[in-house]
Amino acid sequence: MRHGVAGRKLGVTSSHRAAMFRNMAVALIKHEQITTTLPKAKELRPVVEKLITLGKRGDLHARRQAYAQLRDDVIVSKLFSAVADRYKARNGGYIRVLKAGIRHGDAADMAVIELVDRDVAAKGQDSGPRPEAAAEDSLAA
């Protein structure tokens, strides 16, 4: 019996699940809206909500905890500056999960997961190297 066992396995190993949620959390903070399957979106919500709460705390220990989870300096900086400032007055409920129909290939329930009061300009942001880094590299060469 599995009484009181929380969370979904999603058909993958625990290490795969951890990596998947890390990648999805980084993508959600970067683009502020992503499309995924409904069970993954529902499992991702508490992960990102806790990260935003860490960003609101803003101290060094919280920053190190967020970096241990996300492993991306740029995203941690965005989390602790822009995202944390946006939700200073809000106590939880930073994430919205909307149903988005079914996927035609396998009839999986799809969902859009997004930050509440999101920045619309962040969606579709370049996933490649940052323009600042490219400019620095060209100046150094």
From Swiss-Prot:
UniProt record, GO biological process: translation
Family statement: Belongs to the bacterial ribosomal protein bL17 family.
GO cellular component: cytosolic large ribosomal subunit
The organism's taxonomic lineage, starting at the top: Bacteria, Pseudomonadati, Pseudomonadota, Alphaproteobacteria, Acetobacterales
Membrane-spanning segments: none
Single GO MF descriptor: structural constituent of ribosome
Protein's name in the database: Large ribosomal subunit protein bL17
Gene, per the UniProt record: rplQ
Disulfide linkage: none
